[in-house]
Amino acid sequence: MKKAHMFLATAAALGVAMFPTQINEAARGLRNNNPLNIKEGSDGGAQWEGEHELDLDPTFEEFKTPVHGIRAGARILRTYAVKYGLESIEGIIARWAPEEENDTENYINFVANKTGIPRNQKLNDETYPAVISAMIDMENGSNPYTYDEIKKGFEWGFYG
């Protein structure tokens, strides 16, 4: 038996599911468990909680789980609120996705329309998870995460 066939037979016998096309076709943020596409820090300094040990993507952070990635995003949003007073969709997205690199206005409109939250309304504990969910959708073209996963990551990052 050829090595490749033997490997596949062994994997099947062990109950290992292999879906390489699904993994490879997933958006980069989903593959990296970084659904908000947080970029690597320029200083190479402190590690995020739950950051993956293997740094295979030189541009974007990689996390052990999606909830760790959502937590990191919520941590950044907390900094935006506390340090910069950015607590609306418009304020957050203007900083998160600056015009030099993004269609910021389209991003703001997408999140506002998806959530039904006015772009200048101050966010709260009930509205942040919906905004994060819409941002994940915008960043990746889809959002496979449940409300509970997003809320857990938000609360852990914003208040933890």
UniProtKB/Swiss-Prot annotation:
Bilayer-spanning residue ranges: 7-23
Major site of localization recorded for this protein: virion
Membrane topology, as annotated: Single-pass membrane protein
Aminoacyl-tRNA synthetase recorded as keyword: no
Keyword Nucleotide-binding: no
Cell location: Virion membrane
Gene Ontology terms: cellular component: membrane; viral inner membrane; virion membrane
Full protein name: Protein P5
Native species: Pseudoalteromonas phage PM2 (Bacteriophage PM2)
Phylogenetic classification of the source organism: Viruses, Varidnaviria, Bamfordvirae, Preplasmiviricota, Tectiliviricetes
